[in-house]
């Protein structure tokens, strides 16, 4: 067994890289001193691993360890069984089958079944054993019951049984021997340190015995077996049990054994038994060598018995774990100080391992030794008994030196292979460590597997070559058998791989057996067994998991075939993890496979064989490793002497044992060398140590060569294997730790002696069933199977990745290989190869440092194992306490102060339709274009025409006929596009089913270009069909489209959906757009001339006669070019259509735009490199489909538009902003170019699509006007001529050559990385031959930007026109809206069209607003007087029938509350609540007050002076609307809303001036009358013009109610008339009491207003917005056209606000404003109480108290709209002039200053003007001149005049 362990250790090293192994081993020595005491070190080759295994030191008392361990083992076993439950349950069946398999033992199929039965039976045995005390008899009786029956049968026909077992064992050995030997060792130690070791050792012994019936018999003489039997009184039982155990192992009894094979041994007993074992081991091994094959067969029986006894003993602990009595030597029997420390450590480990023979271990088991060794070790020891002298023959100093040379030279190979090339001794040591530690064994197997995989391609031949002709013969036989087996395998390919591996494994087993037995007959028997086992394995694989196990088996078999070529460690581990994960996750049909997979995790090969037999697999792999090693040992006659090192170490357990291998005669040594070489090549790490000891330098060199070859194969294979085998996405370390935790839980009482640093790492990877030192010591890690990533329930999505990760980690446990494996997850094979190559040249010292770091990392990971592992995909683990933490008991943490926002819980109120907008993509009704938006019905033609008429009457001068047909057409086109996209996606879905992987790749690369034509052709057909279906639907239902498909999938922004296609579609700025269009037209003409000139020039080159004409034309062109400026700067506010105008004109004229916007990297170098070539010529994209598609410059993604990334959903994306390759964006467009062009322009969808649209439009009942239809047809033709409609065929000749145009967006926005951006623009301007357009929102940019360019200024379009445009957009979306909402919205957004449209889309797609029943308001005046006004204005005859229709037609409800939603008022007031009525209502409740404060705070946070702007409507004073004036046509006049917004026309001024005329009226009748009349006009104009600092939102429903109330009062007041009022006021100042009372009433109201305005002015001056203190934006300077350029004030101010936040500032302002307003309102209300008394006295002051408001002002809910009158501009100019003077330039708050200063200045100017008129004869000194207030005289005159 020690030999097996050594082999496992040797196998493990190969994955470890030489440099890494050396440091690990050196550490081992250093650690060994401590490790000898601390079995921990044995477990973990690296200190880090050890620490990982048992981070906290265990009690020094071994009894505590073991006593804890056995129960822990039972628990662990139970836990492990639970973890491995699926696999172990199979083993239980396997145990049951074990009995059957004995019968079936002769039959391969029966063996397979038996293996399964043995597994299940073993599981039962394990359970029983776990329950059973240390007494093996009871467990043995149970095991023996099933196993003994098998064994009895086998013993009855020992030879037959042996042969069958041999066949089975050989097969298992072939399949498993290399991996399984390691696996069984690993499994026994890792999974069930006691049970597993006994079981695995027992299995291996039995398997070897069965395989070679002489295998064990040869290696284990009868005497040895007898000694074992003698040692263990229960040996006979054990033999029976072992035989049955072997059968059960073959039948997957290993799992059960693993679970139950742990023995508790006292320290004293351990020492005593160790001495006895040492004495016994040597003779036993010697006897085993001497014993003939027959004797061997007997011995095999006895050996099986003894092993079974041991296994039973260990089965009590755990079947697989064999406790070995280690001999205590004060000094390792063989240590050479001359040899480097690394090799000395390895050699010492080998010596120690050799000293502790399997016999000794078995004896120790009898004595309950503290050390657990696997069967293979026992078997090896039994197989070869030798003197301690044999150790020297194993590795001489010269050999060591040679090895060191080889080790140093092939560092890269060593790194890759885990120091396969490094000394055999290292490998042996590693193997020993692995062997000692079940995990090590697994890691060895993994190493072997990795090595085998690496060599697998070359591996079989190499392996055969290495092993020799005999091995070749065996391999051939095995191959033949394997081929047969493969044929039998359910999956031939997988079975074939598995068989190949099995062949190699069998070959190795045969070698080992041959080495052990040295008999051809036994070899033949082994071949037969191996072939049988292979067949069984393959069959079992098929049975258990045809896919997974077969894969595993193939992997394992490959590993076996060429331990050289076998699957890399990763593969093995992958296989294990895969099988386990499949078993656990998928609950593979065979719990056996699961248990096997668990074992496989311990042994990758075992997992492969698991399909056959977990026991057999383990035995095979173990036998491979152990048999080769054992053969080497037997030939060498080397014994393992166990040496107890007592050097105290704090961090390690008190007992540490070193196993020294005692090599025997050189003949056997040579044989072993050959075998070891072969095994080294094949097994990689398993036999590497034995080989190292026995191999000569030649062997080493050969091994190095093989390793190098194998590494290359391994690199390629490991990756593939990882992908195939490992289902879990996890790093090797992660896998290992959870597995180790599992192991520790299952096998707590097993002590694993680990001498090889790399061995432990590999076992960790394999460790699902391997025991870790924690398990051995009884240290139970609190990781349940659930926590183990391998067992985690993982979504199938992540299985492949996890499998890969798990595969990579396997090699990572060798220090170097660990790093490599960890990186393999991230890097591809080439990266790993490069890294290995680079690492190969590193000095040993550096390699050691790297290994130390890796070890420290392992230690850290081990320490952190107590915490729940972080898994990205992890389901809630009910067993984990972290998911059930109690809330903190601290009241400070549990009792938080509840924030009382005083917001009404709307859910408790009656839910109004639209109050909660839930987006459901699947709604029942598919009739609406906005199906998911409350399923709005498609408006019929009658309804649409009525609503259009309503819009027309709200804004009669807006050309609805110009815009609405185009908008409606775009909506229909969008629906067609969406249906096409849907069909395209359906097509893609169909294709994706056939080409899933390829489709995924293409999706990432945004679709291959090759597929586009086919896709488009298919899509065209589908689209045509769908469009026909749509038209049919429309005909039948009157609905445009069934939006059920489109619902919820609209990904196109409305700014792109309704983007203007021609210059005529733009709103406002007609002159600027016309100028831009003419400029581009000139450039287009010039480009065409140049093109013609070039064509002529080419012809003229042929005909030189025309050269004179050419020169002349060229000169004229040059003159024209010099006259035409190539750059235009467009300035204007944001969102007014600058970029839209550029695109519309370019679309119309056929320009192709290269856009560089702020989202691109715009450094000058990048721009020049990307665009310079394109700027040197006019034409781009000679062939036309894509000629006008814009190109977005983006340094990051040249192939994509920077503005949008195609979304995976079914979406209709912007035709302009989305990369053309996306079918969504391209829609009807054809193959799009690979450039960064996005079809910004609205491209009509191909001729067929146009026909469809035409049909839709014709079928659309909503459009019946012949004009509208004409408009549509005209638009179509226009689009066709303008290349808006890009037919797939050819474009017009003029469109084929697209003139390029460079558009630089937001040139005033420059980031740090945009170095040289402006200089690059200037370079373009100077050198380009194409037009360049710059856009900016900074009005001062033209002043600071040097260059020759023309400036075109865009201004804010008419507010009412934009509102009507938005209404039409809503109408196309089947929403009826109120113009007041949009006027308020645009006022709040300062008429930003883009922002408003986007918000409108959000609002409508969110379900719209509150639906209100509203009559059709065909009016030009106030909505209150709808019918009257309509009759007054004399509606056309057209409208009357419509009005009559209105009564018949069910008008849709009106969606209101758009602006309120924007301002968040719906969160404060329920939709049914009226804001204005709430404010007019006297607030008495605390809740109402909180609501009022919150409302005002919300407005303050949005810089909206709500109360100030809406005093007319919220004060209890009457309001009257002034009739329409000639200025109402304002829409024709464009006003800068933002500037208007900045103009502060204060109500205070209005009130103060109103007060003045009232006082004056008392003096002069006529003048008073005039003033009063002017006063009303004054207020009208004042209210016409908004206070620009005020962007106010509107409450639609409430204002209507209020205005209706106030309207009655106004109408009454008006009925009385201003004239009679004026006549009354004309008389002398009131002397009567009635007159005095009325004057007092008016004066009191004015005083209250003035007080309120004074308070607000004070607040404005005192409490400035904190946010504006630290930044200076254009808002502060726009009134003077001044601005701080971007970037100068972007940094945060160092000043602190002392915690004064904008929130607190807004709350303070809101509170003061609320208090002041409440005082004012209550005072006015109180004063109005005297109104009736005044009326009784005969005087009605109502007219004096009335607010007169313009109709436009009345249209704005609660914000003053930007006035469209010239007076507003005059006022703004006056304000700018006054406050730009030096004296007033630095006045603090602009708003407060305007309110405070302007009224006084106006009064002074008026007075001074009168004085000047009176002093006409002499010079007049103006007051302003006297105080040196330098205001221009023109401004003074303007101030002196009445308000403009």
From Swiss-Prot:
The keyword Secreted does not apply. Residues 987-1032, 1092-1106, 1602-1624 have a biased composition (Basic and acidic residues). ATP binds at residues 1132-1139. The keyword Phosphoprotein applies. Residues 178-204, 477-499, 580-623, 658-700, 987-1047, 1092-1118, 1203-1235, 1272-1292, 1591-1635 are annotated as: Disordered. Residues 664-673 have a biased composition (Basic residues). The modification Phosphoserine is found at residues 44, 219, 306, 311, 354, 369, 602, 614, 621, 817, 1116. Gene3D superfamilies: P-loop containing nucleotide triphosphate hydrolases. GO terms for molecular function: ATP binding; ATP hydrolysis activity; DNA binding; DNA clamp unloader activity. Residues 178-199, 580-592, 599-608, 685-700, 1272-1285 have a biased composition (Polar residues). Keywords: ATP-binding, DNA damage, Isopeptide bond, Nucleotide-binding, Nucleus, Phosphoprotein, Ubl conjugation. There is a cross-link at residue 127 (Glycyl lysine isopeptide (Lys-Gly) (interchain with G-Cter in SUMO2)). Has an important role in DNA replication and in maintaining genome integrity during replication stress. Involved in a RAD9A-related damage checkpoint, a pathway that is important in determining whether DNA damage is compatible with cell survival or whether it requires cell elimination by apoptosis. Modulates the RAD9A interaction with BCL2 and thereby induces DNA damage-induced apoptosis. Promotes PCNA deubiquitination by recruiting the ubiquitin-specific protease 1 (USP1) and WDR48 thereby down-regulating the error-prone damage bypass pathway. This is ATPase family AAA domain-containing protein 5. It comes from Homo sapiens. The lineage of its organism: Eukaryota, Metazoa, Chordata, Craniata, Vertebrata. The gene is ATAD5.
């Amino acid at each position: 067994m020690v030999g097996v362990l050594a082999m496992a250790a040797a196998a493990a090293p190969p994955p470890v890289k030489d440099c890494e192994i050396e440091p690990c081993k050196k550490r081992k020595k250093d650690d060994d001193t401590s490790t000898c005491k601390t079995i921990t070190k044995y477990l973990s080759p690296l200190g880090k691993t050890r620490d990982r295994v048992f981070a906290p030191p265990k009690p020094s008392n071994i009894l505590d360890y073991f006593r804890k361990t056995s129960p822990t083992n039972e628990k662990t076993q139970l836990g492990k069984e639970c973890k491995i439950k699926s696999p172990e349950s199979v083993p239980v069946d396997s145990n049951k089958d074990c009995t059957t398999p004995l019968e079936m033992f002769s039959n391969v199929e029966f063996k397979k079944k038996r293996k399964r039965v043995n597994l299940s039976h073993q599981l039962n045995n394990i359970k029983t054993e776990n329950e059973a005390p240390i007494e093996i008899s009871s467990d043995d009786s149970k095991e023996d019951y099933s196993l003994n029956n098998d064994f009895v049968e086998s013993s009855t026909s020992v030879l037959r049984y042996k042969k069958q077992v041999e066949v089975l064992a050989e097969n298992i050995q072939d399949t498993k021997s290399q991996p399984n030997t390691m696996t069984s060792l690993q499994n026994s130690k890792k999974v069930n340190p006691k049970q597993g070791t006994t079981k695995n050792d027992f299995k291996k012994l039995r398997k070897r015995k069965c395989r070679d019936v002489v295998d064990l018999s040869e290696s284990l003489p009868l005497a040895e077996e007898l000694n074992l039997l003698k040692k263990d009184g229960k040996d006979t039982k054990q033999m029976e049990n072992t035989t049955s155990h072997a059968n059960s192992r073959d039948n997957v009894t290993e799992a059960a054994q693993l679970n139950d094979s742990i023995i508790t041994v006292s320290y004293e007993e351990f020492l005593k038994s160790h001495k006895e074992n040492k004495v016994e081991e040597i003779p036993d091994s010697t006897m085993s060598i001497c014993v003939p094959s027959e004797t061997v067969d007997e011995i095999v029986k006895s050996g099986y018995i003894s092993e079974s006894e041991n296994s039973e003993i260990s089965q009590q602990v755990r079947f697989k774990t064999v406790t070995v009595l280690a001999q205590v030597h004060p000094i390792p029997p063989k240590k050479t100080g001359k040899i480097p420390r690394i090799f000395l450590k390895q050699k010492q480990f080998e010596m120690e391992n050799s000293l502790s023979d399997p016999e000794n271990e078995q004896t120790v088991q009898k004595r309950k030794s503290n050390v657990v060794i696997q069967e293979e070790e026992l078997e090896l020891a039994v197989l070869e008994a030798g003197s301690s002298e044999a150790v020297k023959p194993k590795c001489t100093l010269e050999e060591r030196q040679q090895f060191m040379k080889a080790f140093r030279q092939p560092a890269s190979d060593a790194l890759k292979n885990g120091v396969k090339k490094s000394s055999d001794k290292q490998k042996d040591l590693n193997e020993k460590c692995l062997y000692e530690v079940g995990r090590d064994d697994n890691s060895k197997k993994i190493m072997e597997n990795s090595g085998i995989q690496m060599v697998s391609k070359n591996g079989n031949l190499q392996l055969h070559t290495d092993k020799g002709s005999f091995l070749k013969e065996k391999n051939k036989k095995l191959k033949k058998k394997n081929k047969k087996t493969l044929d039998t395998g359910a999956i031939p390919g997988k079975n074939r791989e598995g068989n190949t591996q099995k062949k190699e494994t069998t070959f190795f087993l045969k070698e080992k057996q041959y080495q052990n037995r040295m008999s051809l007959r036994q070899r033949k028997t082994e071949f037969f067994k191996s072939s049988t086992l292979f067949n069984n394995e393959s069959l079992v694989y098929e049975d258990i998991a045809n896919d997974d196990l077969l894969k595993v088996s193939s992997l394992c078999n490959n590993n076996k075939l060429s331990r050289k070529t076998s699957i890399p460690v990763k593969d093995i581990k992958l296989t294990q993890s895969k099988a386990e994960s499949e078993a656990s996750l998928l609950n593979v049909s065979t719990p056996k496979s699961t248990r096997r997979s668990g074992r496989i995790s311990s042994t990758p090969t075992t997992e492969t064989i698991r399909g056959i037999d977990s026991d057999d697999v383990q035995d095979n792999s173990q036998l491979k490793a152990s048999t080769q090693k054992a053969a080497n040992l037997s030939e060498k006659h080397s014994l393992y002497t166990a040496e107890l090192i007592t050097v105290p170490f704090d961090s390690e357990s008190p007992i540490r044992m070193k196993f020294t291998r005692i090599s025997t005669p050189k003949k056997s040594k040579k044989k072993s060398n050959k075998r070891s070489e072969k095994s080294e090549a094949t097994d990689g790490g398993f036999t590497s140590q034995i080989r190292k000891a026995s191999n000569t330098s030649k062997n080493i060199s050969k091994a190095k060569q093989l390793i190098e070859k194998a590494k290359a194969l391994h690199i390629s294979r490991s990756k593939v294997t990882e992908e195939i085998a490992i289902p879990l996405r996890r790093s090797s370390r992660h896998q290992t730790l959870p597995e180790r935790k599992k192991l520790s839980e299952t096998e707590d009482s097993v002590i694993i002696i680990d001498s090889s640093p790399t061995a432990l790492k590999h076992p960790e990877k394999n460790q699902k069933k391997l025991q870790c030192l924690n398990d051995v010591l009884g240290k139970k890690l609190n990781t349940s199977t659930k926590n183990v990533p391998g067992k985690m329930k993982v979504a199938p999505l992540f299985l492949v990745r996890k499998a890969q990760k798990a595969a990579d980690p396997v090699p990572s446990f060798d220090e170097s290989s660990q790093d490599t494996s960890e990186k393999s997850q991230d890097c591809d094979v080439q990266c790993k190869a490069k890294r290995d190559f680079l690492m190969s040249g590193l000095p040993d010292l550096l390699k050691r440092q790297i290994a130390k770091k890796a070890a420290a990392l392992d230690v850290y990971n081990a320490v952190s194992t107590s915490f729940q592992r972080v898994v990205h995909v992890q389901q809630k683990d009910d067993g984990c306490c972290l998911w059930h933490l109690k809330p903190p008991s601290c009241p400070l943490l549990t009792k938080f102060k509840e924030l009382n926002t005083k917001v009404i819980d709307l859910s408790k109120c009656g839910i109004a339709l639209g109050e909660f907008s839930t987006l459901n993509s699947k709604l029942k009704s598919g009739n609406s274009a906005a199906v998911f938006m409350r399923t709005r019905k498609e408006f019929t033609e009658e309804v649409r025409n009525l609503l259009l008429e309503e819009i027309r009457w709200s804004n009669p001068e807006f050309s609805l006929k110009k815009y609405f047909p185009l908008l409606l057409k775009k909506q229909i086109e969008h629906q067609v596009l969406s249906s096409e996209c849907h069909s395209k996606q359906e097509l893609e879905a169909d294709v994706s089913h056939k080409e899933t992987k390829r489709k995924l790749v293409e999706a990432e690369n945004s679709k291959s270009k090759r597929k586009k034509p086919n896709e488009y052709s298919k899509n065209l057909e589908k689209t045509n069909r769908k469009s026909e279906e749509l038209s049919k639907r429309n005909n039948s239902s009157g609905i445009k489209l069934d939006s059920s498909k489109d619902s919820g999938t609209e990904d196109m922004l409305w700014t792109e959906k309704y983007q203007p296609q021609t210059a005529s579609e733009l709103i406002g700025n007609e002159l600027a757009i016309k100028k831009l269009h003419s400029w581009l037209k000139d450039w287009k003409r010039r480009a065409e001339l140049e093109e013609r000139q070039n064509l002529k020039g080419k012809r003229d080159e042929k005909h030189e006669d025309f050269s004179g004409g050419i020169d002349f034309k060229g000169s004229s062109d040059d003159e024209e070019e010099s006259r035409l400026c190539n750059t235009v700067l467009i300035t204007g506010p944001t969102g007014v259509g600058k970029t839209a105008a550029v695109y519309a004109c370019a679309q119309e004229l056929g320009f192709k735009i290269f856009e560089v916007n702020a989202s691109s990297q715009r450094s000058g170098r990048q721009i020049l490199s990307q665009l310079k070539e394109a700027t040197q010529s006019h034409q781009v994209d000679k062939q036309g489909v894509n000629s006008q598609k814009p190109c977005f410059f983006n340094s990051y993604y040249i192939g994509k538009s920077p503005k949008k990334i195609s979304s995976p959903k079914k979406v209709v994306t912007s035709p302009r902003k989305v990369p053309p390759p996306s079918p969504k964006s391209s829609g009807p467009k054809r193959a799009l170019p690979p450039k960064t062009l996005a079809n910004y322009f609205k491209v009509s969808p191909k001729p067929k699509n146009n026909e469809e649209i035409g049909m839709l439009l014709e079928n659309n009942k909503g459009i019946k006007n012949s004009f509208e239809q004409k408009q549509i047809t005209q638009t179509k033709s226009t689009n066709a001529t303008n290349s808006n409609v890009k037919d797939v065929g050819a474009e017009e000749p003029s469109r084929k050559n697209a003139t390029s145009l460079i558009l630089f967006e937001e040139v005033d926005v420059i980031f740090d990385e945009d170095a040289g951006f402006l200089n690059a623009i200037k370079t373009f301007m100077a050198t380009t031959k194409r037009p360049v357009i710059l856009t900016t929102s900074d009005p001062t940019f033209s002043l600071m930007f040097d260059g020759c360019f023309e400036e075109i200024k865009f201004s804010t379009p008419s507010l009412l026109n934009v509102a009507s445009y938005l209404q039409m957009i809503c109408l196309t979306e089947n929403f009826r809206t109120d113009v007041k909402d949009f006027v308020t919205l645009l006022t709040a957004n300062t008429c930003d069209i883009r922002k408003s449209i986007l918000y409108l889309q959000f609002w409508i797609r969110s379900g719209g607003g509150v639906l209100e029943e509203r009559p059709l308001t065909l009016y030009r005046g106030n909505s209150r007087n709808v019918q009257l006004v309509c009759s007054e204005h004399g509606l056309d005859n057209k409208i009357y029938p419509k009005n009559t229709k209105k009564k018949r037609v069910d008008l849709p409800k009106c969606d209101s509350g758009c602006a309120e939603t924007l301002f968040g008022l719906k969160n404060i007031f329920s939709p049914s609540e009226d804001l204005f009525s709430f404010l007019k209502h006297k607030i008495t409740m605390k809740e109402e007050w909180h609501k009022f404060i919150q409302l005002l705070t919300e407005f303050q946070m949005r810089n909206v002076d709500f109360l100030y702007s809406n005093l007319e409507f919220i004060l209890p004073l009457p309001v009257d609307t002034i009739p329409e004036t000639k200025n109402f046509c304002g829409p024709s006049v464009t006003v800068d809303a933002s500037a208007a917004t900045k103009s502060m026309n204060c109500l205070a001024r209005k009130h103060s001036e109103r007060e003045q005329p009232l006082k004056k009226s008392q003096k002069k009748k006529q003048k008073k009358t005039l003033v009063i009349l002017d006063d009303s006009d004054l207020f009208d104009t004042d209210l016409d013009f908004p206070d620009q600092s005020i962007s106010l939102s509107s409450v639609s429903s409430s204002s209507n109610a209020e205005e209706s109330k106030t309207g009655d009062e106004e109408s009454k007041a008006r009925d009385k008339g201003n004239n009679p009022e004026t006549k009354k006021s004309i008389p002398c100042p009131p002397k009567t009491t009635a007159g005095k009372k009325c004057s007092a009433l008016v004066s009191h109201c004015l005083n209250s207003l003035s007080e309120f305005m004074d308070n607000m002015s004070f607040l404005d001056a005192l409490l400035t917005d904190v946010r504006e203190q630290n930044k200076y934006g254009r808002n502060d300077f726009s009134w003077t056209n001044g601005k701080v350029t971007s970037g100068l004030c972007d940094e945060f101010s160092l000043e602190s606000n002392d915690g004064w936040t904008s929130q607190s500032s807004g709350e303070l302002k809101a509170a003061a404003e609320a208090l002041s307003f409440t005082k004012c309102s209550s005072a006015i209300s109180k004063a109005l109480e005297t109104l009736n008394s005044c009326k009784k006295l005969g005087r009605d002051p109502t007219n004096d108290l009335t607010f007169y408001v313009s109709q436009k002002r009345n249209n704005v809910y609660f914000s003053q709209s930007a006035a469209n009158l010239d007076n507003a501009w005059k006022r703004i100019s006056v304000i700018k002039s006054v406050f730009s003077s030096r004296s007033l330039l630095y006045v603090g708050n602009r708003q407060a200053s305007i309110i405070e200063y302007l009224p006084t200045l106006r009064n002074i100017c008026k007075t001074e003007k009168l004085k000047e008129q009176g002093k006409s004869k002499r010079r007049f000194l103006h007051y302003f001149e006297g105080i040196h207030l330098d205001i221009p005289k023109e401004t003074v005159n303007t101030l002196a005049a009445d308000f403009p």
